[in-house]
Amino acid sequence: MSEKQTGSANGGLGKTLAQLEQVVSASLRPLPSQTGDGTYVTEQVKTGILKDLSHVDLGDLKTLVDVSKSALTGEALDDRKYIMERVIQLSAGLPSTSQIGKELTNTFLTTLWNDLEHPPISYLGRDAMYRRADGSGNNVLWPHIGAAGTPYARSVQPKTVQSPNLPDPETLFDCLLARKEYKEHPNKISSVLFYIASIIIHDLFETDRKDPAISLTSSYLDLSPLYGNNQQEQDLIRTFKDGKLKPDCFSTKRVLGFPPDVGVVLIMFNRFHNYVVEKLAMINEGGRFTKPQESDTAAYAKYDNDLFQTGRLVTCGLYVNIILKDYVRTILNINRTDSIWSLDPRSEMKDGLLGRAAAQATGNQVAAEFNLVYRWHSCISQRDQKWTEDMYQELFPGQDPSKISLQDFLRGLGRWEAKLPGEPRERPFAGLQRKADGSYDDNDLVKIFEESVEDCAGAFGALHVPTVFRSIEALGIQQARSWNLATLNEFRKYFNLAPYKTFEEINSDPYVADQLKRLYDHPDRVEIYPGIIVEDAKESMAPGSGLCTNFTISRAILSDAVALVRGDRFHTVDFTPKHLTNWAYNEIQPQDSVDQTHVFYKLVLRAFPNHFRGDSIYAHFPLVVPSENKKILTKLGTADKYSWDRPNYTPPPQFINSHSACMSILSDQETFKVTWGSKIEFLMRHNNQPYGRDFMLSGDRTPNAMSRQMMGKALYRDKWETEVKRFYENITLKLLHRYSYKLAGVNQVDVVRDIANLAQVHFCASVFSLPLKTESNPRGIFTESELYQIMAVVFTSIFYDADIGKSFELNQAARAVTQQLGQLTLANVELIAKTGFIANLVNSLHRHDVLSEYGVHMIQRLLDSGMPAPEIVWTHVLPTAGGMVANQAQLFSQSLDYYLSEEGSVHLPEINRLAKEDTTEADDLLLRYFMEGARIRSSVALPRVVAQPTVVEDNGQKITLKQGQHIICNLVSASMDPVTFPEPDKVKLDRDMNLYAHFGFGPHQCLGLGLCKTALTTMLKVIGRLDNLRRAPGGQGKLKKLSGPGGIAMYMTPDQTAFFPFPTTMKIQWDGDLPEVKE
């Protein structure tokens, strides 16, 4: 009998014995007498842990450990380790009577259930895609929650028996609130923080005068003071054209009763919205905002609405980021530290051993108690107190505000509001006059904002509300009573705060404590309002206590902030790049490396791009007065990163467009000066030494000319042309072999990212002995991609710093990487200077046989001049290298892009033929093809500053230029000037080579002109040799570019999250095999 048969027989025998055992057991049972139907009562037997362990092996124990570890830490499970399947095996392997097996199965079922929302909280469809005007539909299943026109919620159950005869509201004001003397805020918080608070308050609370239980605004942070509380109000603020709002308008009338600074902040959000929708339409991500003909009414209405609604989501997203990253961080005094921590309710949470994750996107309904929490009149500055007193004199001429009866006060407010026009553009604002386009003059708005930043707010506490607010506070007390709310102590207990046992605990000032005692008799009877604003204020603590508000308020506002944000679907589960677009989502995100994640500057610089420097302290930290910010940032060691100058208008540069005018300006070094010196010095300054000032492009002085002469001699050696040509042919082919691949049998490569950009990186590293990590130099520091990014950032910071909203971030990043690269390069140069042995060793690490005259040899030639190594590196090598890589790469990519276009592709067969000829004549024609492609796709613009008054003729017009005026020589338009280039849209190979403008002109013409022409023509030759060269299908085969000012191209990153001055990606395809690399 075989082993298999024996096993089968034994198994059968075991089964038979088990059956016999069951029969015997059944025969020994007593008759069933416990049931009426004659059946036995059975008990489910549960096996114990010892019996279960007999079914568990080491693999099962490992499964339990892995699952427990994930539950404890929240760490994701690696499904490639088959943990789910192992759990199933373990559960299935335990006896059916196993209690552990049952618990394990139930846990598994619970996990699977909890994987999905029940019910779902995010939905598809246009109805759920955007915020509704009245806030309804935030919770799709309970759409009324938080909608405008619904009742306030009640948070705290009022159980305390209170006297029906409570103290007179005006007496309460006089006893507890009236300002005796002004006290500045202890942390020197500016009034801007309280203007943001005013917007938040009026975003969430607007009590219906006819029914005080109703709030006329939504319960969400949706910027309703700007956009309106309902569809009718929202329609009044919209232009219904291209998704835009009416310029410099806001919906609410109530803000006009506040100092104009509040309205200015709303106008800034208005401008940000209009900026966003312009960019959304321009980028048109995935064809989402393709503009139809306006005659197609329905299609255009959809286009306009999609832009408007998406722009609103984005603007509200920035608004909430300002609240969480600027406002709340300042409230908690984290702005005084170098921490990037923030109390962000959008944090991703998962259930764990310590409890369930907080729910999100549930909706929100504001509570009446919180309507009272945010009444912060004690913090009104002396400046704003004066403004309010002046306004009262307009409303109630000759009357003392403290003596106005409540009835007269309400009638006066009613008359004032009734006079305000319904049309937002017609309402008076701060005495300003609108311009023809409906906007206000930037100078006026900036002046108001600037003064707001410098205006220190008042302190929290009793006896600090200006008397002009007597009637308003009395109305607030009456309103609170009409809501029948809980007492101060009940409100504190709700937040698990100890109730006050004595009046001195409420306020340690003997006078205030005594007044409370006379008014309320017992601490338990003190009303929530004014109780919460007469408590002692917290002391400053960094981090922890920055607002220094009353004790109960400091706790309540944090709970409210979490509820408002985490409960809002559009700020949580639907706050995604898919809803906002990749660019817009990235545009409003905080950066860890900028301002410790503060984002207010994003609003300021988009609203007033011509008044603030990119590093202005007024833009970056406006919630604290500048003088206090100076102390804070000096202590943190970052004060020198910012400009402390007051905002000042800088006119946009004058564009010069004709070829003749551009060439004339670029040739006139006396009248027109270069502007890059301060940028170069900023990046190159090292160990407090002002390096970079004498670099060739830093100025128009003699040392700058000498720098150009020195670097020119170093670059253009004997046989340079032969060496450069051989290098580029070799490296281009090598990169093609390394980075190309086949998709379904078709050759493909990203010709921009992996060929054009990296070829320049390799050349630059070889020429200047930079620490590039490659297969032949594994001990290098930077990868090809990293070194390209460094060089691109440096070049952008110096020559393309045109986006004021990104300027600070760009320049700080550029300085950081420049310093890092510079120190490594300096160490290398100093080694070469000290010893020939090490120099030879370094040379072997960086050597490229083709470039025998460069690398270590070139560094040695520079050292032979007697110049110190730091001066060589920081003033000459780094700026030259930084100006080379990205510029050369973009010129090649732009030229190739033209020849891959529909109009340019007719030339590809001839380029292919010439590339294969490999003759001097063919190479000369390829150079002309390259120059024409680069001319047609040029995106070069060169700035100059006018040194002395002059007149320039540009396209037949006389332009008067003033001293100090900034101009832009637009080489895009100059390169397409039909006077210089007849039929400019066509490729002509007989044009005068001296007229091409894309390398600049005059004494600051690109030093690498000759080198570039040779290098990039060689690259065109290698790529052009590929058969049936063509774009990859779809968007991947095209450069994503938009037309900026003056027609200058703006490119985008591959994921379209940001603009970039250079091409970033474009994939090409071809037929046949690549030629072998000739070593």
From Swiss-Prot:
GO biological process: oxylipin biosynthetic process; prostaglandin biosynthetic process; response to oxidative stress
Catalysis performed (reactions): (9Z,12Z)-octadecadienoate + O2 = (8R,9Z,12Z)-8-hydroperoxyoctadeca-9,12-dienoate; (8R,9Z,12Z)-8-hydroperoxyoctadeca-9,12-dienoate = (5S,8R,9Z,12Z)-5,8-dihydroxyoctadeca-9,12-dienoate
Binding residues for heme b: 202, 377
Cofactors that this protein relies on: heme b
SUPFAM superfamilies for this protein: Cytochrome P450, Heme-dependent peroxidases
GO MF annotation list: dioxygenase activity; heme binding; iron ion binding; isomerase activity; linoleate 8R-lipoxygenase activity; monooxygenase activity; oxidoreductase activity, acting on paired donors, with incorporation or reduction of molecular oxygen; peroxidase activity
Region described as Linoleate 8R-lipoxygenase: 105-446
Positions of region (9,12-octadecadienoate 8-hydroperoxide 8R-isomerase): 654-1079
Domain of life of the organism encoding this protein: Eukaryota
Active site: 374
Enzyme Commission numbers on file: 1.13.11.60, 5.4.4.5
UniProt cross-references to PANTHER family, sorted A to Z: PROSTAGLANDIN G/H SYNTHASE, PSI-PRODUCING OXYGENASE A
Physiological role: Bifunctional heme-containing enzyme that oxidizes linoleic acid to (8R,9Z,12Z)-8-hydroperoxyoctadeca-9,12-dienoate (within the N-terminal heme peroxidase domain), which is subsequently isomerized to (5S,8R,9Z,12Z)-5,8-dihydroxyoctadeca-9,12-dienoate (within the C-terminal P450 heme thiolate domain). Oxidized unsaturated fatty acids, so-called oxylipins, derived from endogenous fatty acids, influence the development of the asexual conidiophores and sexual cleistothecia and regulate the secondary metabolism.
Family, similarity comment: Belongs to the peroxidase family.
Name of protein: Psi-producing oxygenase A
